């Protein structure tokens, strides 16, 4: 039986692509383990899936000054030792890393054990963890073709982003019933990220009188951001977040307004949903969402509404443009084959 160790954590975005790949390896009877941090989100997600989980010490990698920067390099070194010992016991044939600060000790520990390491980079430019890890990797899978210019060419394989199978299996009728929506008006799903986005939430709610004339709205507004005064508004459903219902909601969705995190937008792309993308500004991030969104716009999958330009008038304008040019967007979206991503990654894992 072949063995694989997965790693990646710190945010859900460093875990969900692993969850897209794991079921296919389980079908092929791989022995699967996961190495992550002691208290990261990856621990909760992976243990819920029933996959053996091993925790190690890890320090956060920061690009800015923080007193914790003095302590954290020692935690990383301890994490390398923890990972080295654990990998030596597990004896995997291959390690697959999705990035995040916890992945660095695992990648180095794998390399020290002479285990082939495969990385996946979701964004246009590598994050700090993958920048460190890539020198220890034998192959690097990239979500965006443009990412290749930032990485060692001899290691790069373009795959796109692996998408969870359950996301593709939504039921439109169940979605309509869950939302209480009719079939008469198109549905817009609006997502501001797991924590929500104050400016997006406020603008959407201010634009409701105009938007609800032509559309039905699903608003995933983030934890603590519900507006009780709108709970019974016809044609408008708001949720802090959804779990099992998301595939059915996406099956109902005609258009998406969203942040531009790589995993989410590739799910919309695979489902062929035209998008208005509102990337996090450079003030709130390293600018990766802006690059992601602009790439999608160049390929005809989406239009980009920059954070600083978000207001009621611009939001309505972008929604109308999306609606009027729906067929143009759909034609572009059909060119992408999302199923190839998992197929290519599985093939390379098997050959490692």
Curated annotation (Swiss-Prot):
EC top class named in words: transferase
Compartment list: Cell membrane
Reactions catalysed: di-trans,octa-cis-undecaprenyl diphospho-N-acetyl-alpha-D-muramoyl-L-alanyl-D-glutamyl-meso-2,6-diaminopimeloyl-D-alanyl-D-alanine + UDP-N-acetyl-alpha-D-glucosamine = di-trans,octa-cis-undecaprenyl diphospho-[N-acetyl-alpha-D-glucosaminyl-(1->4)]-N-acetyl-alpha-D-muramoyl-L-alanyl-D-glutamyl-meso-2,6-diaminopimeloyl-D-alanyl-D-alanine + UDP + H(+)
Keyword Plastid: no
EC number of this enzyme: 2.4.1.227
Binding site for UDP-N-acetyl-alpha-D-glucosamine: 11-13, 164, 194, 289
Annotated GO CC locations: plasma membrane
Pathway in which the depicted protein is active: Cell wall biogenesis; peptidoglycan biosynthesis
GO biological process per UniProt: carbohydrate metabolic process; cell division; cell wall organization; lipid glycosylation; peptidoglycan biosynthetic process; regulation of cell shape
Major localisation: membrane
InterPro entries the record matches: GlcNAc_MurG, Glyco_trans_28_C, GlycoTrans_28_N
Chain coiled-coil ranges: none
Function recorded in the entry: Cell wall formation. Catalyzes the transfer of a GlcNAc subunit on undecaprenyl-pyrophosphoryl-MurNAc-pentapeptide (lipid intermediate I) to form undecaprenyl-pyrophosphoryl-MurNAc-(pentapeptide)GlcNAc (lipid intermediate II).
Protein name, entry field: UDP-N-acetylglucosamine--N-acetylmuramyl-(pentapeptide) pyrophosphoryl-undecaprenol N-acetylglucosamine transferase 2
Taxonomy of the source species: Bacteria, Bacillati, Bacillota, Bacilli, Bacillales
Gene symbol of the encoding locus: murG2
């Amino acid at each position: 039986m072949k063995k694989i160790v997965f790693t990646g954590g710190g945010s859900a975005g460093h875990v969900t692509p692993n969850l897209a790949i794991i079921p296919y390896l389980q079908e092929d009877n791989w022995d699967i383990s996961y190495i992550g941090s002691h208290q990261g989100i990856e621990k909760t997600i992976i243990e819920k899936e029933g996959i053996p989980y091993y925790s190690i010490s890890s320090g956060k990698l920061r690009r800015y000054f923080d007193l914790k920067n003095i302590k954290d390099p020692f935690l990383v070194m301890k994490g390398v030792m923890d990972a080295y010992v654990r990998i030596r016991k597990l004896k995997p044939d291959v390690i697959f890393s999705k990035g995040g600060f916890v992945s660095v000790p695992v990648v180095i520990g794998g390399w020290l054990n002479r285990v082939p390491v495969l990385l996946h980079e979701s964004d246009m430019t590598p994050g700090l963890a993958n920048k460190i890890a890539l020198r220890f990797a034998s192959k690097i899978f990239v979500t965006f073709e443009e990412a290749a210019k930032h990485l060692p060419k001899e290691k790069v394989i373009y795959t796109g982003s692996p998408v969870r199978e359950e996301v593709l299996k939504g039921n439109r009728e169940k979605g309509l019933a869950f939302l209480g929506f009719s079939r008469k008006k198109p549905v817009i799903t609006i997502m501001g990220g797991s924590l929500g986005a104050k400016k997006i939430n406020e603008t959407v709610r201010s634009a409701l009188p105009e938007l609800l004339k032509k559309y039905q709205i699903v608003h995933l507004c983030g934890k603590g951001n519900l507006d009780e005064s709108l709970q019974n508004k016809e044609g408008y459903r708001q949720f802090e977040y959804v779990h099992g219902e998301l595939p059915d909601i996406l099956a109902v969705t005609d258009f998406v307004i969203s942040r531009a995190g790589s995993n989410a937008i590739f799910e919309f792309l695979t489902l062929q949903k035209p998008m208005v993308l509102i990337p996090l500004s450079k003030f709130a991030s390293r600018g990766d969402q802006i690059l992601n969104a602009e790439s999608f716009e160049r390929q005809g999958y989406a239009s980009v509404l920059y954070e600083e330009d978000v207001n009621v008038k611009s939001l309505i304008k972008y929604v109308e443009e999306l609606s009027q040019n729906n067929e143009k967007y759909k034609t572009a979206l059909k060119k992408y084959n999302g199923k190839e991503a998992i197929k290519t990654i599985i093939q390379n894992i098997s050959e490692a």
